Curated annotation (Swiss-Prot):
Alphabetized GO MF terms: zinc ion binding
Region (Disordered), start-end ranges: 215-245, 277-303, 360-422, 451-483
Pfam name, any one: RUN
Organism encoding this protein: Homo sapiens
Domain RUN: 41-183
Consequence recorded when altering E729A: Disrupts interaction with RAB7A
Tissue: Expressed in placenta, liver, prostate, thymus, spleen, ovary, colon, colon carcinoma and peripheral blood lymphocytes (PBL). Weakly expressed in brain, lung, kidney, and testis. No expression in heart, skeletal muscle, pancreas and small intestine. Predominantly expressed in the breast carcinoma cell line MCF-7.
Identification of the protein by name: Pleckstrin homology domain-containing family M member 1
Outcome after substituting H60A: Strongly reduces interaction with ARL8B. No effect on interaction with RAB7A. No effect on late endosome and lysosome clustering. Loss of interaction with ARL8B as well as late endosome and lysosome clustering
Cell compartments where the protein resides: Autolysosome membrane; Endosome membrane; Late endosome membrane; Lysosome membrane
UniProt-listed GO biological process terms: autophagosome-lysosome fusion; late endosome to lysosome transport; lysosome localization; positive regulation of bone resorption; positive regulation of ruffle assembly; protein transport
Length: 1056
């Protein structure tokens, strides 16, 4: 077993080192990505540093029995090297991880060790945003921590654990897409072991060792294998290459002074990086060329191997640049620069450093290869990172950089071999992917070159000769492409996409200042903040009514809707127009008037001034451009004036330049695999494979439509995994979107996002649109049926209910029906509010008593409320915890009489004495309301104030609101009704007009005036509504005298 103190740092001394690395890397990531919409990938050096620091957190303080020596015989070690320790804590991680995640990690193709699963688990947890949750669960498992860690371990320290939890909260603002399927993860690298104290920290710095020997292999932490592409970047740390070592793309990554970097395109299925002595996954006999175990090398060996490297590159055209005592650099494109996969935002260059005084042999060698050298002219620095450009003859091609459009050409996975000139030192440099994007509104991509008709200076007037994008002018590069067996891109596509060389750009920049040959295209660039978050504009406008009268209203403009309210204080919506139905936007007049025309409706509005009206119109147009189907912004294609009219033909299987300028959606549907052998969901009305457009690419998902939700599944290990779920109530509209490429494209607009989808053919897309519309219609009919339980509603109630139904309409069904708890599996372990993962080893789920659904701790904060359905059916007055969504819904409809108790459960009056008394008082109040409504004294207005504007109490005795049920549960409703009855009855007794509307008992003929609301002393005929004394009616027992007279008169009329 290995001792931590003997081989590395003291356990207590390692903790601040780990914290320093973690804090620095997270702060760097936040500073770079927090204001961008891009994701953090494994190509970022700070992300790799953060992963190493987190790995050190889990390694620090492990018991010796969980640390074993390096796996036997996988790498060949020299006599000076010691085996790296291999700590394993995979069983600990399995205790807090969901079974689906464990199954996925254990079935990865190239990750086949427990060490690899530990490292893959950490990166997958960062991708899913669950690192904080996992760590919280681990800190609660004290028994397991005691089993795996020493008392001095970082995870055993309560204060350090709290620090980690609070610090990892900063990762919630970042989105990760780290690689976790690479075979590189199968063994530990040096960095986490050194940070945790298992290895000396001095081994992290290769310059700290002697210049003749390297005691330890370099760390592979900077090796980045993006899981979403097939690009692998190898960053070597200044190590020498043995003179007998085979020269490959990876061994050509040299820099005698500092580290150099190489971006190579590898097939992730067959050419994954391995350690020295290991075999590739396809069991090839020859060790992989990316081995970093270099053994012992001296300076002379390095120089000789460098010459061999330069000889290997001798077939390519390179500009040899002699200078007068100054080291100058120029750049030429490498094949990797033009064949980088889509999504890699780096450009690769070969920097040729010329010596201060070139040797004659070198000059001769350059001449033999066809490279002519001339004295350079002093020039100003170019904006494209060219330190000092050089001059070339007409026979020599200048260097050029590759535009971002050309970087997206390559989709192949062949390993491209670079070639370079023999006479100068080479430095292969990949621009850092972590460099921040230009946030300016105008970039170099926004500039057009002068038109072809514009006369240009001759080649002799420029320090750099004109460029010809033909294969013949670049024989070396063309020969390289013709010999490459895995070519995937045409040279013509590369040449068309190339940006002018730095020298030529500088040469043309000077005259452009005087003649203004450039023109700037103003367009918003990628990576800037999204302006469509929340409300786009709000304020006060006036609307012209039917009679030409202007009424002041409060207006809100959102990315999808244009809403008008009565006032800012009283947030009652009077008009709600969907921008999807907007037909035209009128101009702004001098007095501030403007018009908005929707389908079947025209809004005549007036702002305070013309400028304010124009601002409203600009915001509306901006929202319309966002919400409507629009063609993508055209890319700027920078071409040379003297470029041939017809570029060379592209080989088969290659994207043409027109494909580069088009939306990825325009690709042919034959490239997609539409087969799916998954079993449909039990409640699915329609389920099929659709392609979803996200992150500028089409991804396959299985969509399942039911009467309740539209679910989105992704396929992992031939199993369906729920990715997202959209309730039917959140679907706003479904529209065809032929602008994406054809009739098979459509989009679904939901409350959370706009889903751009592609079906297999136009008929399939039409079927999806028809079924989604039918499900929406069924849902709306169900909502209307639920509303009818409350009887007829006034206009205000309808508007409020419409607003509440639009946001949380699915909750309306639970207003009068007790919910059935379906279980967490029916939700796919996702929160019903925010789609966050909940359940075992995730956030603890919380049950909402109102809807019977499960929510996370953010959407459910244990707000207590009575459940209306339980009061109606079970007379359960207990307050139960409900989610924030249900609380908001109950607050919105609190004062609306949506529950008709006579229709829902009339037996409640019979079985509950309190409800029987409440029912009688509600009937009394209704009868008193009839009297006060006919009185001209204004008593009805006073009664309305006492009712708190609940006028429905005077209209129907059986309509109840949520506020009524809450007061019944609190025991104050009976007193509230009693006070109203006393006030109204006192008015009737003392009002001359109301007294004249009383009754005289027709049985006893007494002169006392009686009223129908006196339930204790009077009785009323159900047929003619005549009122009698109860005692008189009980003595006579002959029924109603008035009804008897009416029947007698009718019989006489019949006989007559």
């Amino acid at each position: 077993m290995l001792s931590v103190v003997e081989n590395g740092l003291d356990p207590q001394a390692a903790i601040p080192v780990i914290k320093k690395k973690l804090v620095g890397s997270v702060k760097a990531l936040q500073k770079q990505y927090v204001s961008l919409d891009t994701v953090v990938t494994s190509e970022d050096g700070d992300a790799n540093t953060m992963c190493s620091a987190l790995e050190a957190v889990f390694i620090h303080g492990l018991h010796a029995k969980h640390i074993r020596a390096e796996a036997g015989g996988k790498r060949k070690k020299s006599a000076h090297q010691k085996p790296l320790p291999q700590p394993v804590f995979w069983p600990l991680l399995k205790a807090v991880t969901h079974k689906h995640i464990i199954s996925e990690l254990e079935h990865l193709t190239f990750v086949n060790t427990d060490v690899g699963r530990c490292r893959a688990w950490l990166r997958l947890a960062l991708n899913d945003g669950l690192m904080e949750c996992y760590l919280k669960l681990l800190l609660q498992e004290q028994a397991r921590l005691h089993e795996y860690y020493q008392p001095t371990a970082l995870l055993r320290d309560a204060e350090e654990g709290e620090f980690l939890l609070s610090f990892l909260q900063g990762l919630t603002s970042l989105s990760f897409e780290l690689s976790y399927k690479s075979a590189i993860l199968n063994e530990w690298t040096l960095t986490p072991l050194a940070l945790s104290g298992l290895c000396p920290l001095s081994e992290l710095d290769p310059l700290s060792t002697s210049g003749a020997e390297l005691q330890r292999k370099e760390s592979l932490d900077s090796i980045s294998h993006s899981s979403g592409s097939e690009d692998i970047e190898v960053h070597h740390s200044g190590h020498k290459i043995r003179r007998n070592q085979k020269l490959t793309a990876s061994s050509l990554s040299l820099d005698t002074a500092s580290s150099s970097q190489l971006s190579c395109s590898l097939n992730s299925d067959s050419c994954l990086l391995q350690e020295n002595g290991s075999k590739s996954p396809d069991h090839c006999e020859e060790p992989m060329s990316c081995d970093s175990d270099l053994g012992t090398a001296n300076a002379e060996d390095s120089d000789r191997s460098l010459q061999e490297v330069l000889l290997e590159f001798s077939k390519a055209q390179v500009n040899s640049v002699p200078t007068n005592g100054l080291s100058q650099e120029t750049e030429i494109p490498t094949p990797q620069a033009s064949l980088s996969l889509h999504g890699l935002n780096t450009s690769t260059y070969l920097h040729c450093e010329a010596p201060a005084e070139p040797l004659p042999a070198q000059a001769a060698s350059g001449t033999q290869d066809g490279v002519h050298v001339q004295e350079p002219r002093p020039q100003a620095p170019s904006p494209l990172d060219l330190q000092q450009p050089v001059e070339s003859t007409s026979g020599q091609q200048p260097s050029s950089t590759v535009s971002e459009t050309a970087r997206e050409v390559g989709q192949g996975n062949g390993l491209q071999k670079a070639q370079a000139h023999d006479g100068a030192g080479l430095k292969l440099v990949v621009s850092s992917p972590t460099s921040p994007k230009n946030k300016s509104w105008i970039s170099e991509d926004d500039f057009y070159r002068p038109s072809r008709e514009q006369p240009l200076e001759s080649a002799s007037d420029h320090p750099i000769a004109s460029y010809r994008g033909t294969p013949g002018s670049r024989p070396g590069l063309h020969r390289h492409f013709s010999q490459e067996p895995r070519k995937n891109c045409s040279l013509g596509a590369l040449d068309q996409a190339c940006v002018p060389s730095p020298g030529r750009r500088q040469a043309q920049a000077a005259p452009s200042q005087g003649h203004k040959s450039f023109r700037v295209v103003h367009r918003r660039q990628m990576g800037l903040s999204n302006p469509f978050r929340g409300l786009m504009k709000l304020g006060t406008v006036e609307r012209r009514g039917a009679m030409g009268i202007w009424k002041e209203l409060f207006c809100e403009l959102s990315p999808l809707e244009f809403r008008l309210y009565l006032s800012n204080e009283e947030h009652t919506c009077v008009e709600n127009c969907s921008l999807l139905r907007c037909e035209s936007v009128g101009p702004a007049h001098s007095d501030g008037r403007f018009e908005l025309v929707f389908s079947g409706k025209k809004l005549a509005l007036r702002a305070s001034s013309q400028d304010e009206a124009e601002d409203w119109l600009d915001r509306v147009r901006e929202a319309l451009q966002k919400v409507r189907p629009q063609q993508e912004d055209e890319w700027v294609n920078v071409q040379y004036p003297d470029q041939p009219e017809e570029p060379p033909e592209a080989p088969q299987g290659c994207l043409s330049p027109s494909d580069l300028l088009s939306e990825p959606a325009a690709l042919q549907g034959t490239q997609f695999d539409w087969s799916s052998a998954q079993v449909p969901e039990p409640d699915a009305i329609k389920e099929s494979l659709l392609y979803l457009y996200m992150d500028r690419t089409w991804m396959p998902y299985i969509f399942s439509l039911s009467l309740e939700a539209l679910k989105c599944f992704r396929i992992r290990n031939n199993e369906k995994m729920l990715s997202d779920s959209h309730g039917v109530e959140t679907i706003r509209d479904i529209l065809p979107d032929t602008s994406l490429g054809g009739p098979s494209f459509f989009k679904i607009i939901t409350a959370k996002a706009v889903l751009k989808l592609q079906a297999g053919n136009a008929e399939e897309a039409a079927l999806w649109r028809d079924l989604v519309r039918k499900v929406l219609a069924s849902y709306l009919e169900t909502a209307e049926e639920a509303v009818t339980l409350g009887g007829s509603l006034d206009e205000n109630c309808q508007e409020v209910l419409k607003f509440a139904t639009r946001e949380n309409g699915f909750l309306l069904q639970y207003l009068v029906a007790i919910p059935m708890e379906k279980g967490l599996d029916s939700q796919g372990c996702f929160c019903a509010g925010c789609s966050r993962q909940i359940g075992f080893s995730f956030v603890r789920p919380k049950l909402c008593a109102f809807s019977g659904l499960y929510y996370c701790d953010i959407c459910h904060q244990d707000d207590a409320s009575v459940i209306p359905a339980r009061i109606i059916h079970n007379w359960d007055l207990t307050k139960r915890p409900i989610c924030r969504q249900a609380l908001k819904f109950l607050t919105q409809i609190r004062a609306q009489p949506l529950i008709n108790l006579q229709m829902v459960n009339a037996s409640l009056y019979e079985h509950v004495e309190r409800m029987h008394l409440i029912g009688r008082r509600r009937e009394q109040l209704k009868l008193l309301g009839d009297y006060l409504g006919l009185c001209r004294s204004g008593a009805l207005k006073e009664l309305s104030k006492r009712l708190n504007h609940r006028n429905y109490l005077l209209e129907s005795p059986h309509r109840f609101s949520v506020a009524d049920l809450q007061q019944i549960a609190d025991g104050v409703y009976e007193g509230f009704l009693k006070a109203l009855i006393e006030f109204a009855s006192q008015h009737v007794y003392h009002c001359d007009l109301c007294t004249q509307r009383g009754f005289i008992c027709q049985i006893c003929q007494h002169h006392d005036i009686i009223f129908p609301f006196e339930f204790d002393t009077t009785v009323r005929c159900a047929e003619c509504k005549t009122v009698f004394h109860q005692s008189c009616q009980a003595v006579v027992k002959k029924g109603c005298p008035r009804c008897a007279r009416r029947r007698k008169y009718q019989e006489q009329n019949i006989f007559a």
